[in-house]
Amino acid sequence: MEREENIEIKNSFDYILNSVTGLIESRLLYILVKHKVPEVFEDGLPKTYQQVAEKTQTSPIGIYKLLRYFTTSIGLFEEDLNNLGTFKKTPKSSLFTSDKYATFVEWCNNDLAYNMMKSLDLSIETGEPQCHKSLGVNSWWDLIKKPGEEEFFKNAMKVSSSEAIESALKFIDFSPFKKIVDIGGSHGRFVCEILEKYPNSHGINFDLESFFNGAGELIKNPRLEHKSGNFFESVPEGDCYILKRILHDWKDEDCIKILETIGKSILPGGKVIIFDCIINPKNYNKGHLYLDVMMFHFFGSEEKTIKQFSNISDKAGFKIDKVVNEIPNYCLIISKKD
């Protein structure tokens, strides 16, 4: 009986330990991608930790601890048990390379991200977004207007949405649309990929003037225009509007205003395609709830249920036509009510 109790206590402590190590693990992930450790293994050959340290300009003892940790915790590497200190890649490690999700991982775990979380307790206590208070700015939007931050943020979001873009091109038919407007489209990648698949369509990448001024080179296509503006004031005319990870930044009343603005410009028979998480109260998803907390802390907004989307659409003069479940985190297609 005593032995069983000891096992239970040990398992309980392991559970607690696994629950409280997120801080150090996320920071170690930042270090991993900052020094491009996964890239070192992309040739598929085993490496000693000394070789990895030399290539990444880190200390041998430090990189050994890093490799060993991620071999054990999330299976990024494998250590040769017959030649300890020699590691090789796994399929998971490739996800953390620069051409995959490294930029997103870095943005989520860099110094700025850690500072943003210092006031999370205030958001929970007050019920209002307090992220800006730990950063010395008036709002989260002021933060990303700082030199370099908006571009870094947009690049991170671009990487994180790759899977959604691929799925959208697979499961949504854009052929009926002649003019596709991507609201908050950043560099224009999404709408450009749509145009490549649908040669009879034209596109408009619509974003803030402040972003275009600091965005560097935008994606070019003879059938693509880049236009600046404010979606609370007006948007270009089109028969298809894309809202990818836009509405979750805003409270319901602001979402209604955005859709009302689109409603003034949308052509007859047009559609609005919304890419956002859909919270299912009967089957919660940890990733959705993580984003829900972040949106609350940053903006006072949230990830929404299908009921909320229905109410928002209805009040803005739209109706839900379809939920596309095949797309990661889901997608809604809405149109103007008759």
Swiss-Prot record:
It comes from the Eukaryota. Its EC number is 2.1.1.-. InterPro entries: COMT-like, O_MeTrfase_dom, Plant_O-MeTrfase_dimerisation, SAM-dependent_MTases_sf, WH-like_DNA-bd_sf, WH_DNA-bd_sf. S-adenosyl-L-methionine binds at residues 184, 207, 230-231, 244-245. PROSITE patterns: SAM_OMT_II. GO terms for molecular function: 3,5-dichloro-THPH methyl transferase activity; O-methyltransferase activity; protein dimerization activity; S-adenosylmethionine-dependent methyltransferase activity. It catalyses: (3,5-dichloro-2,4,6-trihydroxyphenyl)hexan-1-one + S-adenosyl-L-methionine = 1-(3,5-dichloro-2,6-dihydroxy-4-methoxyphenyl)hexan-1-one + S-adenosyl-L-homocysteine + H(+). This is O-methyltransferase 4. Gene3D superfamilies: Vaccinia Virus protein VP39 (3.40.50.150), Winged helix-like DNA-binding domain superfamily/Winged helix DNA-binding domain (1.10.10.10). Keywords: Methyltransferase, S-adenosyl-L-methionine, Transferase. Belongs to the class I-like SAM-binding methyltransferase superfamily. Cation-independent O-methyltransferase family. COMT subfamily. GO terms for biological process: biosynthetic process; methylation. The active site is at 248 (proton acceptor).
